[in-house]
């Protein structure tokens, strides 16, 4: 899978922009706050219809404009697929092959991406919400049905939480049980998919982590399900508690992940270097896992992470990705990028203008 070209209209600081990409490696070079990350954000938006930097869509639209559009051409093994995502006061429209997709689950996965940004280093030591988002994004690209169940679960969760905010004497437990059934139906599928994903991810990540640490460290990933027994029974047993607290206290929306090196919890006791190595091992593992599950390698987006990694980890990242994935890198300097291949494109970014090095 390759992204051949992208076109932006009123996206962030780009009023009009068209770029053709190298099928192997693309580097965006420039000082901070010039618009490098905006390009990777646009690719992320084209793939997932969402930004990785903000949940406020209005921030993506250029100043004084009312709408924006990101379009691109994706080259797959047996087809070339034009993609387009628009934002306007009327909402969001996603198109594949010039046809509007009414369901997000039918669009996501057309362009598979793997984003590695400084905030991804928070995967190990950040909040549980960060790790749940990680599972949701990656699984949503691999299995469309997961995205469908996740959306249905979140809709039911929102409805149940809103109902729990009613006065206690106005709550009908029979209706609450109906909502419980909807949560359990989709929540059970989510938990099963997450467990299968983590089991497979761990297999790949363990091998990579062992290579990165020269056999000195053994990585283990634990999926901590919030639901310990039967989801339906736990929801029923907690109804009074949830009515009192005005929120749903059990379910996959409270799941988490834990990472261990040689039986030591990395988040609590690992060094910063160990935490970074775990995050890197997981990202590199995803490359092969996505290919294993879908038959397509994802596009790799490296947003200013090279400066966060030492030379050894930089080399491991580049060597693992090149030859498999089309890679996009943003950086302020090429000094720390060693052993770059000759077949690449370098784009110089300055104040929202981009020039390709000849």
Curated annotation (Swiss-Prot):
Effect of residue 81 to I: In strain: ATCC 7962
PROSITE patterns reported for this sequence: RECF_1, RECF_2
GO annotation, cellular component aspect: cytoplasm
Any GO molecular function: ATP binding
One Pfam family cited in the UniProt record for this chain: SMC_N
Main localization, broad class: cytoplasm
Localization: Cytoplasm
Annotated CDD domains: ABC_RecF
InterPro entries, A to Z: DNA-binding_RecF, DNA-binding_RecF_CS, P-loop_NTPase, RecF/RecN/SMC_N, RecF_2
Binding site for ATP: 30-37
Record keywords, A-Z: ATP-binding, Cytoplasm, DNA damage, DNA repair, DNA replication, DNA-binding, Nucleotide-binding, SOS response
Effect of residue 74 to G: In strain: ATCC 7962
Annotated family: Belongs to the RecF family.
Function comment: The RecF protein is involved in DNA metabolism; it is required for DNA replication and normal SOS inducibility. RecF binds preferentially to single-stranded, linear DNA. It also seems to bind ATP.
Protein name, as recorded: DNA replication and repair protein RecF
